[in-house]
A protein has these predicted regions:
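Anionic-ligand-binding alpha/beta catalytic cores of soluble enzymes and soluble regulatory domains
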Residues: 292
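Conserved beta-alpha junction segments in alpha/beta enzyme cores
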Residues: 1-276, 280-287, 300, 304-461
Length: 461
């Protein structure tokens, strides 16, 4: 699915948006989760098995068309730490018949990257078994084990399939409105140059038949409300923001992540409902989400989005030079699509570009993008770790002649790790690193992404 074959510069005649929505639980019963399934987040030497379930985990889906005859675009948002491209492709394949019947031009599967969700990436399994036993299994053609649970993944993919079918089957015509709220007080950026999208971005769909509204909301705040090493299953702050939106506006909700690479939650009396100094992490996470929900509900300054949706995807190869990730891959900790050729070892992934209306665009990124790559402000010369300049224009600058404002859809269709400007890629042990380089494919990831994005923009014109 490459997206819309043709990019339109203006809405088609008599164009109107149509949107369908669905949400459903992906959690299996508690007995099958607690003490049996691993939790995402930071890698642990101890078995990081779930000890409790605080919140439900869901898949939420929006199916959108601009009635131009170029098909339906589907956005799937999953409460998960990460999904690799092979799993995303299985989800797409499960609805191949529907895609052909309904002319679905793209299915974008993203995650909210909760560090407290069931491990769907694989890196949080029994580290000793993965490091010591899996290599031997690979050598002799055996089945490796990691943090993923086969039954859970099968159910997750089934629920994604059902959700896509339901969203496509419930599409109705209406209008789309765009508004923002300031999110700068809610986030902490832990790494220079401290660039971010300062807004919660809300896309509010109002059906013409008076049925329930659907809100698509982006945020750049990491879902680490209960810490990265916890064992309690939670949906983090989006779960509680959604509850407030349900109660206040009665709307359907789908959150997705922007460029949230090194951000964290700034929790204090201004950003947490009923704040107390002695709050537990879970209490503070809930109050943080409730405050965000109220902020999103308070948006009043909106503009109508013209009924135009252009989508384009491109296959890309990203070189792997991080020796730790190479070893982790051999140990079965990750299930990325790896390609070897005469030039080295690569991850095969996808990169996307979306135009929404006449004023907005999205870079669709298969990992965690440094915001400065999207919006500008990369460190230059002596201010960078290498002392060298960064010579690529930002993604926003690449589309400047379109007059569109760029936003980011992060962790979409794959999880290739952190994407850091080449000239500011530093040793993993450096204090300023914040461990980003530990889970990055390597020093050339950003320049590869930027070059491919520039090519994608050119192909779209």
């Amino acid at each position: 699915m490459k997206g819309t074959e043709e990019f339109l510069s203006a809405p088609a005649e008599n164009a109107v948006f149509s949107l369908g929505y669905d949400a459903r639980s992906i959690l299996t019963d508690a007995d099958s989760v607690i003490g049996k399934m691993y939790v995402g987040g930071s890698i642990s030497l101890k078995k990081k098995l779930a000890t409790a379930i605080e919140d439900d985990l869901k898949v939420r889906t929006a199916a959108v068309s601009d009635s131009s005859g170029r098909g339906i675009s589907v956005l799937v948002s999953v409460d998960a730490y990460g999904l690799s491209l092979p799993d995303v492709r299985e989800i797409r394949q499960s609805v191949a018949g529907l895609a052909k019947e309904k002319n679905i031009n793209s299915i974008t599967v993203t995650v909210l990257h909760q560090h407290s969700a069931v491990d769907t990436l694989g890196m949080n399994g029994n580290i000793f078994e993965m490091a010591l036993v899996n290599p031997a299994k690979v050598l002799f053609g055996g089945q490796t084990n990691n943090g993923k649970n086969d039954a859970y993944m099968e159910n997750l993919k089934l629920k994604c399939k059902e959700s896509i079918e339901a969203a496509v089957g419930s599409m109705t015509a209406g209008k789309l409105y765009y508004g923002t709220a300031d999110q700068s007080a809610y986030l902490i950026d832990k790494r220079a140059p401290y660039v971010s999208d300062s807004s919660f971005n809300r896309f509010r769909f109002v059906p013409s038949d008076g049925s329930k509204e659907t809100w698509l909301v982006s945020t750049e705040i990491h879902c680490v409300g209960n810490g990265a090493a916890g064992t309690v299953i939670t949906g983090d702050y989006p779960y509680y923001a959604e509850q407030v939106i349900h109660e206040t506006a009665g709307a359907n909700v789908l959150f997705f992540m922007g460029a949230q690479q090194s951000t964290s939650q700034n929790r204090n009396e201004a950003t947490v409902e009923n704040y107390r100094e002695d709050m537990t992490r879970l209490e503070a996470m809930k109050g943080f989400g409730e405050s965000i929900g109220k902020s999103v509900c308070a948006i009043t300054d909106e503009t109508e989005v013209a009924p135009l949706l252009n989508v384009r995807y491109k296959k890309i190869l990203l070189p792997i030079s991080n020796p730790i990730l190479l070893l982790a891959g051999k140990a079965g900790m990750f299930e990325s699509l790896v390609v070897k050729n005469k030039d080295g070892v690569f991850v095969s992934s996808e990169l996307g570009y979306i135009e929404l209306g006449t004023d907005l665009a999205f870079a669709v990124i298969p990992g965690e993008l440094a915001p400065e790559l999207a919006y500008g402000g990369c460190l230059q010369g002596d201010a960078s770790w290498s002392g060298e300049d960064w010579n690529y224009p930002s993604m926003q600058e690449m589309i400047a002649d379109s007059g569109r404002t760029l936003r980011v859809l992060d962790l979409a269709n794959d999880q290739v790790g952190y994407i850091i400007p080449d000239n500011n890629f530093m040793p993993m042990i450096a204090e300023e690193s914040n461990s980003l380089e530990l889970v990055s494919l390597g020093k050339k990831t950003a320049s590869c992404i930027m070059g491919e994005f520039a090519a994608l923009i050119e192909e779209s014109r």
